[in-house]
A protein has these predicted regions:
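ABC ATPase NBD coupling module
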Residues: 15-17, 71-87, 111, 116-117, ...
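Short coil-to-helix segment of the ABC ATPase nucleotide-binding domain corresponding to the Q-loop/switch region
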Residues: 99-107
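Conserved ABC ATPase "signature" region
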Residues: 69-70, 106, 110, 117-134
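Conserved signature/switch motifs of ABC ATPase nucleotide-binding domains
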Residues: 138-141, 159
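Catalytic Walker B motif of ABC-type/P-loop ATPase nucleotide-binding domains
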Residues: 164-167
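Helix-to-loop junction immediately C-terminal to a conserved catalytic motif
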Residues: 54
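ABC ATPase "signature
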Residues: 224-225, 233
Length: 354
């Protein structure tokens, strides 16, 4: 059952000398209880779009439905009630620095109309949920970035929302802390059944927790679907660029001059398939030599996407047949230009790309 539906949503900003269309005709359906990701490069319109869900940005055109009800025109008490049902976690934490951690939680409880007698117990409960109940009397300035974000998550959950919006909630954190925050959000999703909408430019985040994903570029959704399907077989150039930047592997430049003769090929496979038997079969069948120069595997949920760079050599006819066979059995095949292999991978394009 869908909990969020955006129907042909546009957001236009009118500046003094020009008009900016930040979101252009976006339609999305987000199911109850899922973690839905919106990814894209900076300036794609992700933050503006996610803010239409709780009307921090009101659509210029189109409709926003929550639990099947059109909330686009909500104002006053109706809008305040709506926003209590939708928590928001910001990149910059947005904690109040001159009050304690506990008081930051109480601030949200008070705004949500919770009875004063319940404030302390609810604050303790929320801080226990995020593993920070011992910090209830501490001030935000004494906390690490990860701890501040945990407090921000606890505060966003203060009024038992059905939906949690996360705007680049991990982009200011280091890798280890990011993984801890993602694990916390996944646990909250599972244990509390909260629907999470998470925007990011980091595919490392997307691969760990998103059930479904939409890719944005220039205010438009250019591709969407199950996370593994979108990133294992990208169709739009923006999605392909995101994937290539993330999955790209480079041959160390110092090795390039010493590479023997042959054709250098990048192969990618997905799912449960593996390239090792294929490479052995091709070597045996066609009498060519195949040397693995580099390889990596990334998991999107439980499913792998693997990349290998191999050097293949042999008689011309056998080599052509071997390359055709490899091409037919992988989802991505690219011959690399030896003269460009010293370039950084996926900077201005793929390393060694023709």
């Amino acid at each position: 059952m869908s909990i969020i539906e955006l129907q042909d949503v546009h957001v236009t900003f009118h500046e003094r000398h020009n008009t900016v269309e930040a979101v252009r005709g976006v339609s999305l359906t987000i199911e109850q209880g899922e973690i839905f990701g919106i990814v894209g490069f900076s300036g794609a319109g992700k933050s503006t779009l996610v803010r239409t869900i709780n009307l921090l940005e009101r659509p210029t055109q189109g409709r926003v439905l929550i639990d099947g009800s059109d909330i686009t025109g909500a104002t006053g008490d109706e809008l305040r009630k709506l926003r209590r049902n939708i928590g928001f976690v910001f990149q910059s934490f947005n904690l109040i620095d001159n009050i304690t951690v506990g008081a930051n939680i109480v601030f949200a409880l008070k705004a949500g109309g919770v009875d004063k007698a319940a404030w302390h117990d609810r604050a303790v409960e929320l801080l226990k949920l995020v593993g920070l109940d011992s910090k209830i009397d501490s001030y935000p300035s004494s906390l690490s970035g990860g701890q501040k974000q945990r407090v921000a998550i606890a505060r966003a959950l203060a009024n038992n929302p059905e939906i949690l919006l996360c705007d680049e909630a991990t982009s200011a954190l280091d890798l280890e802390t990011t993984e801890e925050i993602l694990a916390l959000l996944k646990r909250i999703n599972v244990e509390l059944g909260i629907t999470i909408v998470f925007i990011t430019h980091q595919l490392d985040v997307a691969k760990q927790i998103f059930d479904h994903v939409a890719v944005m570029e220039n205010g438009v959704i250019v591709e969407q679907g199950e996370t593994f399907d979108v990133f294992s077989a990208p169709k739009h150039p923006t999605t392909k660029s995101l994937v290539d930047r993330y999955l790209g592997i480079a041959i160390p430049p110092q090795l390039v001059p010493s590479l023997p003769a042959g054709t250098i090929v990048e192969l990618r496979y997905r799912g449960d398939g593996a390239l090792e038997p294929l490479i052995s079969d091709v070597t045996r069948k066609y009498g060519v030599s195949i040397n693995v120069l580099h390889g990596d595997v990334e998991y999107f949920g439980p499913k792998p996407i693997g990349t290998l760079i191999v050097l293949i050599d042999g008689p011309a006819e056998a080599l052509a047949a071997a390359l055709d066979t490899l091409k037919a059995h992988v989802y991505s095949y690219r011959e690399l230009n030896r003269e460009r292999l010293a370039r950084p991978a996926y900077g201005d394009g793929q390393q060694g790309e023709e």
